[in-house]
Design a protein with these regions (language model features):
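Active-site core segment of subtilase-fold serine proteases
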Residues: 164-225, 242-244, 290, 381-464, ...
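Residue-level detector of functionally pivotal "anchor" positions at catalytic/ligand-binding pockets or at interdomain
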Residues: 649-677, 685, 744-746
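Subtilisin-like serine protease catalytic core
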Residues: 20-21, 144-274, 291-295, 322-326, ...
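C-terminal subdomain of the subtilisin-like protease fold in secreted/lumenal serine endopeptidases
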Residues: 56-60, 293-302, 306-309, 320-331, ...
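C-terminal tail/sorting-segment detector
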Residues: 704, 723-746
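Hydrolase catalytic cores
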Residues: 250-258, 284-294, 324, 361-368, ...
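Autoinhibitory N-terminal propeptides
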Residues: 18-148, 156, 258
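Short acidic, glycine-rich surface-loop motifs adjacent to enzyme active sites
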Residues: 253, 280-307, 330-331, 450-453, ...
Length: 746
């Protein structure tokens, strides 16, 4: 621990020396910290009397330097520039490149006048809801009412995630005879001989995929098996069918912080946001090679920042998305965590207590005008320790950085505050604040923080630690559960999905009833992250069911972790080709993202050239507004719950026909039979006559029949002119009223 703090302080102090070797303003903060760490490592290793310069020169050896995957914005002919600096160009979109570069040569690259920015950031987290662990249960997803005529056929759906079981029968068709995964890139695969990729290996075709069996992390992770099932699973011998169940599938297993054990330390910096962007490109390229439109679901994320760590990432995503290329991502699961405080101009102070079980806490202050941070440590005595740091003092310091230490409760507290311009609004300054100790921070006493100063409009974000209330100062209860949307969901070109709730309990495979109440009837799951984004845009964009979704779980995870706590949320175990598989209930915006992506796959089947802007227009016109007391869009629900059927009617241009319902009927299922017939199956025999009216997609009436069912089903014979996709409108008793898109079977 002492060594960690020493290195932290040295890293900060060494930035001035580093500035002589690199153009700091061109580097995102994480890239700066990487190079500073390498420089410090060389300094620490220089214990045999060699000069510091010689030690650094040794560290600059390209052959021995770790490689970083990063975004580079550069002008002109970059081939010779990259070659001279030992860089491998992996992807280019306009003036933005994804490059594998030796860390030792970042400084040299940054000094070149062609280069305006080098950006990278460490990997993401899988976004499973953790509140179920605290409340003791999860529950099942009931499913959406989906149009029979649109199933995702002819559309490529993609998932980038961790923990894939490629052998799960959910990824075959319903009969388990036709395998639907077309291609898989495992970025963590150790089988890199003759690989076409910078990291890992790709696998194509049924035989190769089933032989590989699972992603490298598949014995210990199963997140991707679940999310892919929600999007595209056939439901094999169960009611747990995904949304786009006849789509083709392409998947990428990336690396998250959950996968550190599978990454060699020499390769740690290869797995970044830029590597994720390569994964998205791989899926879109696979779809293009097969002539299919594509939607990708991404159920991972990391916090936003004001530093600009993801500016080039967002620009790259803008380039990758477009007609027939849609990217959907989960909002995050921080909706129950107070992490934001706003002190308006004219107010003297706003604040909260901070709690952490770790040895550090981190805050970010975004300020317009001069403010100060007041930190108080409360003790059992009447004397408290108070620290006040003015933002003006930080700005006046060398390199806009203050480092200090003090004694609190007999222990040393280290403080670091660095200032920089807000990357979204240069009129505002941002201050990164870190508190560190040799032991637990709460050993110094109860800790409160306040933004003070009437002349400033200021925001405080808690990055490490938790903002909590405490009776020691009841006035400090200003923390809000907002401003916590994850990246890349915060990107303008990404469809950001929050989670809402339906079922409140389920029975697991042991027969135990498990209850986890996050609301019903589409109410927002309280864990679902809330906007706005750090630059003030409304997010999430839309909601989808995410609380207690039932989907596929990995047989390899079940085999290797039979006593894991999440196995108690399995609703069924079953055998297939000699292995035991599971259906599992889980919660989080991780579950909502693939469901929304599945709906968009149905829309792409109807209109393969949809752009992200088209999708947002459909969402804005057709989403179900769950809470009618709110105005839409808003930072809780976006435009509301995604509506697969209403969206299809809108795309097909028949939503304006007043006699066609915008919802499917509740108590009757309509299915095509051979010979141009339709079967209507009722939940119970109707007591009154019904009318079935059949419309073409041009809005013309093809047929209309009134009938009195004599049982719980009825068969209609349609005229020969009824072909292709038609709209069937049922009128009569309320529970049977609605419309459905049906593909006629001849």
């Amino acid at each position: 621990m002492k060594k960690a703090i020493l290195i932290f302080l040295l890293a900060v102090c060494q930035l001035s020396a580093f500035a002589q070797r690199a153009a700091l303003g061109k580097l995102s903060p994480w890239v700066r910290s990487i190079v500073a760490e390498q420089r410090l490592s060389a300094y620490v290793q220089n214990s045999n009397g060699k000069s510091f310069a010689k030690s650094t020169a040794d560290a600059n050896s390209i052959s021995s330097s770790p490689m970083l995957t990063a975004f580079v914005r550069a002008e002109g002919n970059v081939d010779s520039l990259f070659s001279a600096n030992g860089c491998q160009q992996l992807l280019s979109c306009g003036d933005i490149y994804i490059v594998a570069m030796p860390i030792s040569n970042i400084a040299s690259l940054s000094q070149n006048s062609q280069v305006s920015r080098i950006e990278s950031q460490r990997g993401t987290h899988a976004l499973m809801d953790i509140s179920g662990a605290y409340l003791g249960a999860t529950k099942a997803y009931q499913g959406l009412s989906l149009p029979q005529a649109y199933t995702g056929k002819g559309v490529m759906v993609g998932v980038m995630d961790i923990g894939f079981d490629l052998t799960h029968p959910n990824f075959y068709d319903r009969s388990a005879t036709n395998y639907r995964i077309r291609s898989f890139w495992d970025q963590l695969s150790a089988d890199t001989i003759n690989s076409a990729h910078y990291v890992g290996q790709s696998y194509h075709g049924t035989e190769a995929l089933l032989r590989y069996a699972h992603s490298r992390d598949g014995l210990d992770q199963t997140h991707g098996t679940h999310t892919l099932g929600s999007l595209a699973g056939s439901g094999f011998n169960s009611p747990y069918r995904g949304i786009a169940y006849e789509s083709d599938i392409c998947i990428v297993a990336n690396a998250t912080v959950d996968d550190v054990a599978f990454i060699d330390t020499a390769d740690y910096y290869k797995f970044t946001y830029a590597t994720d962007a390569l994964g998205f490109k791989y899926i879109f390229d696979t779809a293009d090679s097969l002539g299919m439109p594509c939607v990708v679901s991404f159920s991972e994320g990391a916090p936003q920042d004001f530093r600009g760590d993801d500016q080039l990432y967002f620009a790259m995503l803008d380039s990758l998305t477009g007609p027939g290329h849609i990217l959907v991502s989960s909002a995050g699961n921080n909706g129950l965590i107070p992490s934001y405080i706003h002190k308006p101009l004219g107010d003297e102070s706003r604040g909260s207590f901070v709690w952490t079980s770790a040895n550090r806490a981190s805050l970010t202050i975004n300020s317009l005008g001069v403010s100060a941070l007041r930190t108080v440590f409360y003790h059992d005595t009447d004397v408290n320790d108070t620290i006040i740091i003015k933002t003006s003092e930080v700005l006046a310091a060398e390199d806009s950085m203050l480092i200090d230490s003090t004694i609190i409760a007999g222990q040393k507290l280290y403080l670091s505050i660095s200032a920089y311009d807000n990357c979204y609004d240069a009129s505002r300054q941002v201050f990164d604040v870190q508190f560190l100790t040799l032991d637990r921070l709460d050993a110094l006493g109860k800790m409160s923080v306040e933004i003070i100063g009437k002349d400033a409009d200021a925001e405080l974000y808690c990055d490490e630690g938790y903002l909590v209330a405490n009776d020691l100062n009841p006035a400090l209860q200003d923390a809000e559960c907002t401003h916590n949307i994850n990246s890349p969901s915060a990107a303008p070109s990404v469809i950001c999905v929050g989670a809402n709730s339906y079922r409140q309990s389920f029975e697991n495979y042991l027969g135990d009833l498990r209850t986890y109440d996050m609301g019903t009837n589409g109410q927002r799951g309280e864990y679902s992250s809330v906007g706005p984004t750090f630059d003030g845009r409304i997010k999430p964009d839309v909601m989808a069911p995410g609380t207690n979704v039932i989907s596929s779980y990995s047989s390899y995870y079940l085999e290797n972790h039979p006593q894991a706590s999440d196995i108690l949320s399995d609703v069924a175990h079953f055998d297939f080709q000699g292995r035991t598989y599971a259906w599992n209930a889980n919660s989080g915006t991780s579950m909502a993202s693939p469901i929304a992506a599945g709906v968009i796959a149905l829309w792409l089947q109807a209109c393969p050239t949809l752009t992200p802007q088209d999708v947002m227009r459909i969402i804005s016109h057709t989403s179900r507004r769950v809470d009618p007391t709110l105005s839409y869009p808003n930072n809780l629900y976006g435009y509301g719950e995604i509506n697969a059927y209403a969206g299809l009617l809108y795309i097909l241009g028949i939503d304006g026909i007043t006699d066609i319902s915008h919802s499917t009927p509740h108590d009757v299922a309509i299915s095509p039979l051979s010979g141009g017939r339709l079967k209507l199956a009722f939940a119970s025999q109707p007591s009154q006559s019904l009318t079935a009216t059949v419309y073409s997609l041009s809005g013309n009436i093809i047929d209309s029949q009134s009938f009195m069912p004599t049982g719980d089903s009825h068969v209609l014979q349609l005229p020969a002119s009824a072909s292709g996709v038609v709209v069937v409108q049922i009128s009569g008793e309320k529970q049977y009223q609605g419309s459905q898109l049906i593909r006629i079977s001849k």
